[in-house]
Design a protein with these regions (language model features):
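Amphipathic alpha-helical "output/dimerization" segments
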Residues: 462-482
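A short pre-motif secondary-structure segment
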Residues: 567-570, 612
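Amphipathic HAMP/coiled-coil signal-transducing linker helices
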Residues: 337-341, 486-505, 511
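Bacterial carbohydrate/catabolite-sensing allosteric modules
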Residues: 1-54, 59-336, 345, 525
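A short, aliphatic-rich beta-strand micro-motif
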Residues: 424-427, 435-445
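Helix-loop-beta substructure at the N-terminus of cytosolic sensory domains
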Residues: 344-384
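Catalytic-core segments of nucleotide cyclases and related cyclic-nucleotide turnover enzymes
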Residues: 544, 590-597, 608-609, 621-655
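Conserved long alpha-helical elements within nucleotide-processing catalytic cores of c-di-GMP signaling
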Residues: 504-526, 533-560, 569-573, 577-578, ...
Length: 655
């Protein structure tokens, strides 16, 4: 009897996992989950909510429709990462889903969300320390704050902290020094224009409520000849990599997002397992003020080392003993020529094999899964909202330095055998593991058309999360899958008859050559040649539309008597071919002819007020797969037998 008890699981809903804020949230949640032996399921878009292409964004957001809340024990919603300019459509949709489908406890992060409890980062403490630094260390007297959108809870909280600390310092803490932006580069640029035009007097310092506005403000002023920090000091907030990399590095504040996220896990834990011990929340060393050049300080040594050792520096890389990357290395991804390698592939099987070959770029990871719709390669079928009832796990990758087991093997194959009910999300969730892990569920789509989703499984203590490299890696995969779909469609157009959907002569030759390589030496081929009777008479007397009806009806009969693996072809205006292979005999060829005759008679009988009967002549030839005769020669032989059939039936009708 299996005594395995599944771990408890938390779901984290977030956006753009490579963003600094999201990275801090994920790390804080992950580390605290490890203390409780919880698995963590991260459901995330790969872009921010402010992504300019809203059609593309809708394809990203579909990942949240995958969540089966019955399979998790608690839900964390990173609400601050799921809004744009106070537009809360995504949160409103999530709230509706949670009300309908979720009976588990829910906690919001950093932004009020419905009536769920919210855990906040202490913005006020951070802004106060920034003001103290400017006033006490740089002797600034006249300060402005550039915050986010007016009446937005985060904007107002940071503005309020600014005013309170200004008053505590004995300076002007009135609302006259509060200005509103948009939490983006453009907000800083627009504020710079107001300073440059003289609409606003130049202050000693501007406290920006996030790094993006600080960068926009500083760079715009510098472009117009204003010296930063000599003429005006500028600070940011959030401690993003962009602030660190900026030409004039931005003095910023690293808020304790990590601690906030860990505290949110504790709040869920109290509801999931009431009365049990609550784990301590660790304090990270890098939390607090991070000085840069923009305020007049020297950039901190820790930040310089971070810049030197980052993945943006091709000379400093951390690797595993096998040479694979262990940290974010964008340069390594570029040097892999992954996109170029994938973009030339036209075959569905080959694309899966090649994707498997480049999963080394994701290391260190535990497992990688690619889950696709069973009809993913058909561009005429679109999936815009939600997922089909069943999905297909076409790929399970295990790092090359790890051995397979009897129950867990590597594979990359689009097979019905790997189909599962979508509500399970991923069958591997229930596999027994010695330690808790993280599953990152990320969207696989092209524009708004969902192809499937990817799952990156990592250890709880892995340095890698779903970072810039892994999200760009998956974007390359998504684009290459779509390219295979498009190429397959173009090839399909070139090898199929548009009227009947049967293969054309080119398609027949291509498929026959492929089939000849696949069959066993003791197999046989059966070829039927079919010719519609009296097509010219029908066209001349009843019109070409009726002639087309006859051709389509005949094609339907041919499809009906053809097996799934048969090659069914329209070779000309009124000429058709069927090619079958396997352990076949001439007797089966004759039986198929009898079925065809009966089926065609039934179709004629079913046609209401028919002006004419549809008839056809058919001939068949059977030959060993080991014969080397050309296809055309065998078709001519079957065509000769078809002609004998036609003559015999014409004589029979005349008699």
């Amino acid at each position: 009897m299996n005594s395995h008890v599944p771990r408890k699981r938390l779901a984290l809903l977030i956006s753009d996992p490579s963003a600094d804020y999201s990275q801090s949230v994920i790390t804080g949640v992950r580390d605290q989950c490890a203390k409780y032996d919880y698995d963590l399921l991260v459901f995330s878009t790969m872009v921010k909510m402010c992504h300019p292409d809203k059609v593309y964004l809708s394809g990203e957001l579909n990942i949240f429709n995958l969540i089966n809340y019955d399979l998790v024990d608690g839900v964390l919603v990173a609400s601050l990462a799921l809004v744009e300019d106070q537009v809360k459509e995504v949160l409103e949709k999530l709230e509706a889903d949670l009300r309908l489908y979720c009976t588990k406890p829910v906690v919001s992060l950093d932004l009020p969300f419905a009536d769920y409890p919210t855990v906040y980062t202490d913005d006020k403490k951070a802004i106060r320390q920034v003001v103290k630094h400017l006033v006490n260390d740089h002797h600034c007297q006249k300060l402005y704050i550039l915050t986010g959108q007016k009446d937005y809870v985060v904007s107002e909280a940071r503005a309020e902290a600014f005013c309170e600390q200004m008053k505590a310092e004995g300076l002007d803490g009135s609302k006259d020094n509060v200005f509103y932006g948009n939490f983006w580069y453009t907000g800083g640029e627009e504020f710079a224009n107001r300073l440059l035009s003289g609409e606003l007097s130049m202050p000693d310092a501007v406290v920006c409520a996030n790094d993006y506005m600080a960068i926009g403000l500083a760079n715009r002023l510098i472009t117009e000849g204003v010296k930063v920090p000599e003429q005006v000091r500028i600070t940011g907030y959030d401690a993003t990599k962009d602030a660190l990399y900026n030409t004039v590095s931005i003095t910023t504040y690293n808020p304790d997002v990590y601690g906030m996220a860990a505290s949110a896990v504790n709040l869920l834990h109290k509801q999931i397992e009431p009365g049990t011990a609550v784990a301590d929340v660790e304090m990270l060393q890098h939390y607090g003020l991070r000085t840069g050049v923009s305020c007049g300080c020297v950039q901190s040594a820790d930040d310089l080392r971070s810049l030197q050792g980052s993945g943006m520096n091709p000379n400093e890389r951390s690797r595993n003993p096998d040479g694979s990357l262990t940290v974010n290395d964008m340069q390594g991804l570029h040097e892999s020529y992954m996109f170029e390698t994938l973009s030339v592939i036209q075959d569905k099987k080959q694309i899966l094999d090649t994707i498997t070959d480049v999963t080394y770029l994701l290391q260190p990871y535990r497992r990688f899964y690619l889950v696709l719709r069973s009809d993913w390669s058909d561009t005429s079928i679109r999936c815009l909202n939600g997922y089909p009832e069943t999905m297909r796990c076409v790929m399970r990758c295990i790092p090359q330095n790890e051995s397979e087991s009897e129950t867990e093997r590597r594979y990359a194959v689009d097979s019905e055998g790997h189909t599962f009910r979508t509500k399970l999300m991923l069958p591997a969730l229930d596999e027994e593991r010695d330690e808790p892990v993280v599953f990152y569920f990320l969207p696989s789509h092209f524009s708004d058309d969902t192809i499937g989703f990817a799952v990156l499984q990592t250890a709880m203590d892995a340095k890698r999360t779903a970072d810039e490299v892994s999200t760009l890696w998956l974007r390359n995969v998504n684009n290459s899958l779509h390219m295979v779909r498009v190429v397959s469609k173009l090839i399909d157009y070139s090898v199929r008859d548009s009227m009947t959907g049967l293969l054309n002569r080119r398609g027949m030759e291509m498929m026959f050559d492929r089939r000849r390589e696949q069959v066993a030496p003791d197999d046989s081929f059966l070829i039927w040649v079919i010719d519609m009777d009296g097509l010219k008479h029908i066209n001349d007397n009843f019109g070409h539309e009726q002639g087309d009806v006859g051709i389509i009806t005949l094609a339907e009969a041919i499809k009906s008597i053809s097996d799934k693996e048969d090659i069914a072809v329209r070779t000309g205006g009124d000429e058709f071919v069927i090619i079958a292979s396997g352990r076949l005999t001439e007797q089966e060829g004759r039986e198929r002819i009898s079925r065809f005759e009966r089926l065609l008679a039934d179709k004629n009988a079913a046609r209401a007020s028919r002006l004419f009967d549809i008839s056809a002549s058919i001939g068949c030839v059977c030959f060993s797969a080991s014969e080397q005769d050309a296809l055309d020669e065998k078709i001519r032989e079957a065509d000769h037998r078809m002609y004998e059939y036609k003559v015999a039936h014409k004589k029979q009708r005349n008699d």
